[in-house]
């Protein structure tokens, strides 16, 4: 019996770099690896990652990305954190060829599926990263370089004792605000009302951001945000969906 070759995609599946924090939730510059127990990476997804990473994938680095070099233009860059299987991200890239999209996802089946769909649709204005988002924001994204941040249906960690694990925290939003250009946007969506209320509280408290909602809370689902499988799941479960759209002030 021949031993199966460990490919690039297999290595991505087994380890991913994550950030660590102090007891009060502040980021500290220390990196460790851990075994990521994800869903099965199909042979098709594995091949898509192995064969297309050079053109669609980016690796973590300790210096800021040069977006002009990466995309070959100076179009605005929109970052999406946690794109799942990537269908809506690819669709947004297709609908907006005058914008560049950068997606972060730690689960390799989703990364493989996103790359496959991007290849199928011949998308050129999209790059993906399989790495912890906090590390990428800290080291790879220059201040005042992003036109927008999208965070759609992140894990709600609905148990109270797990709320500290939610990605939306004051220090996270503070970091996002630093990375946005003036008039850059933060667009979040969730199908958990408690998480929506918490997102609203954190975003409203952030210095340098203002809410675009006419009622100073949530906005109707915008036409430019494609329906995701998580949103469809929420509808089936009778959940509402809450969109938040904040803009960075011009100072």
Curated annotation (Swiss-Prot):
PROSITE patterns: SAM_MT_TRMB (PS51625)
Xref: Gene3D superfamilies: Vaccinia Virus protein VP39
Keywords: Methyltransferase, S-adenosyl-L-methionine, Transferase, tRNA processing
Entry EC no(s): 2.1.1.33
Annotated residues for binding of substrate: 159, 191, 228-231
Catalysed reaction equations from the record: guanosine(46) in tRNA + S-adenosyl-L-methionine = N(7)-methylguanosine(46) in tRNA + S-adenosyl-L-homocysteine
A single GO cellular-component term on record: tRNA methyltransferase complex
List of residues binding S-adenosyl-L-methionine: 80, 105, 132, 155
Gene Ontology molecular-function annotations: tRNA (guanine(46)-N7)-methyltransferase activity
Listed pathway(s): tRNA modification; N(7)-methylguanine-tRNA biosynthesis
Active site feature: 155
Entry-linked InterPro entries: SAM-dependent_MTases_sf, tRNA_(Gua-N-7)_MeTrfase_Trmb, tRNA_methyltr_TrmB_bact
Entry keyword Transferase: yes
Family indicated by similarity: Belongs to the class I-like SAM-binding methyltransferase superfamily. TrmB family.
Function: Catalyzes the formation of N(7)-methylguanine at position 46 (m7G46) in tRNA.
Protein name: tRNA (guanine-N(7)-)-methyltransferase
Gene: trmB
